[in-house]
A protein has these predicted regions:
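Short, aromatic-enriched amphipathic alpha-helices that serve as compact interaction elements
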Residues: 24-38
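Short solvent-exposed beta->alpha transition segments
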Residues: 27-28, 43-92, 99-102
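Bacterial signal peptide processing site
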Residues: 18-20
Length: 133
């Protein structure tokens, strides 16, 4: 029984190290996304996204969506992670939710990255400025 408890504790400790590493890598990806968004490099954001990223075929393209967000929110200067979730296994994902301060208004963002290479698989943003402007 003691051996089993030791193995469980060791497995938990090792997975905690992996999660901490993934949190830091995910935070770096969010910072990179904001740097590209602020610079107007929407093509690069789309090019670096996961090939499996699902975007509706009707309506604006992903690049047009990003351009509209940038135009309405302005420069996004800082952000704070509000939650982190990692789904392990085949097709796993890392999700980061954030409160972001932008020139026009604060925004709530949700990023979904593919496990491993952390390529953008999904993005959503909400803000009053996106609705009224």
């Amino acid at each position: 029984m003691r051996r089993l408890a030791t193995l469980v504790l060791l497995g938990t400790a090792l997975s905690a190290c992996s999660v901490a590493k993934d949190v830091k890598a995910g935070q770096m990806k969010v910072a990179h996304f904001h740097a590209l968004l602020n610079a107007g490099n929407f093509d690069q954001i789309a090019a670096e996204a996961d090939p499996g990223m699902h975007w509706p075929t009707r309506g604006p393209s992903f690049k047009d969506y990003l351009s509209s967000i940038h135009r309405k929110l302005g420069f996004c200067s800082s952000w704070r992670m509000t939650s982190f979730n990692e789904q392990l296994g085949l097709g796993g994902a890392v999700q980061i939710n954030a409160d972001t301060h932008c020139d026009a208004d604060n925004a709530q963002e949700s990023f979904v990255f593919s496990s491993g290479d952390l390529r953008l698989r999904g993005y959503a943003v909400t803000s009053r400025a996106l609705v009224v402007s």
